């Protein structure tokens, strides 16, 4: 029996139970619980240092946890014998920094992991990579190097690179934070289109208007706990906790 034999699409695609994470003596996640269904768009917001980026890095096993459980399609992410390659096929992640290889073209950057890591057929991967560049509205930029692209274009190549592994869940960690204001919109549009196609997306973001428009559910974190969560309308128009109200009053 494989780790995913007991999972079905009617169950949460990501299930987080009572996770705790510390860096030395500092506990940054203090018993987080969350269920995310297939096709949902989840936005995690909160002040700096609230644990939101650490949380999604734990989902992808980039950070370990001290207690609790994270399952993706029934696969226990933090079990000792985890096949990281299997996990990387299930979960894609895009960071604030694009981390593209500067001496590789946009097309080559997208193709690298499927060809070199997954040993997929190069011709088939190239066809998929070209389709992904078109999907993120960068057709015609196949042979461009990262230095020839704007920040927003590089971030869209990074998104296409993650999609090339054909994941079921996409994680976005403040992907617009390092971008010039005029390029933020094009990246958010790409994520919005992914969500419309049914991709399960978990985003850490400071883009409140985007969160309100696209999210199915919003989680507000502060000091390592989920303070409040709800639908966008409920969250923004009828917040209950004083910490949530204070945070929203400072950014809206």
Task: Identify the role of each PLM range.
Residues 9-232:
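ABC family nucleotide-binding domain
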Residues 2, 222-223, 227-252:
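C-terminal boundary and immediately downstream tail of ABC-type ATPase nucleotide-binding domains
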Residues 1-8:
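Short, low-complexity, intrinsically disordered N-terminal peptides in bacterial proteins
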């Amino acid at each position: 029996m494989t780790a995913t034999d007991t999972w079905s699409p009617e169950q949460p695609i990501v299930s987080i139970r009572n996770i705790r994470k510390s860096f030395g003596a500092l506990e940054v996640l203090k018993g987080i619980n969350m269920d995310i269904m297939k096709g949902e768009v989840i936005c995690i917001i909160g002040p700096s240092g609230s644990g939101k980026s650490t949380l999604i890095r734990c989902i992808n096993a980039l950070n370990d946890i001290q207690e609790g459980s994270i399952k993706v399609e029934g696969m226990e992410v933090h079990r000792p014998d985890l096949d990281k390659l299997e996990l990387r096929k299930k979960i894609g992640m895009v960071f604030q920094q694009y981390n593209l290889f500067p001496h590789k073209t946009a097309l080559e950057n997208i193709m690298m992991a499927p060809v070199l890591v997954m040993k997929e057929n190069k011709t088939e991967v190239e066809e998929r990579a070209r389709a992904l560049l078109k999907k993120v509205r960068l057709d015609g930029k196949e042979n461009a190097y990262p230095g020839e692209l704007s920040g927003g274009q590089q971030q869209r190549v990074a998104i296409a690179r993650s999609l090339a592994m054909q994941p079921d869940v996409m994680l976005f960690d403040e992907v617009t934070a390092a971008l010039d204001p005029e390029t933020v919109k094009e990246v958010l549009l790409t994520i919005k289109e992914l969500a419309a196609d049914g991709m399960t997306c978990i985003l850490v973001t400071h883009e409140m208007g985007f969160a309100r428009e696209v999210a199915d559910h919003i989680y507000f974190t502060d000091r390592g706990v989920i303070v409040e969560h709800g639908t966008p309308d409920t969250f923004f128009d009828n917040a209950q906790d004083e910490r949530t109200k204070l945070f929203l009053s400072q950014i809206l």
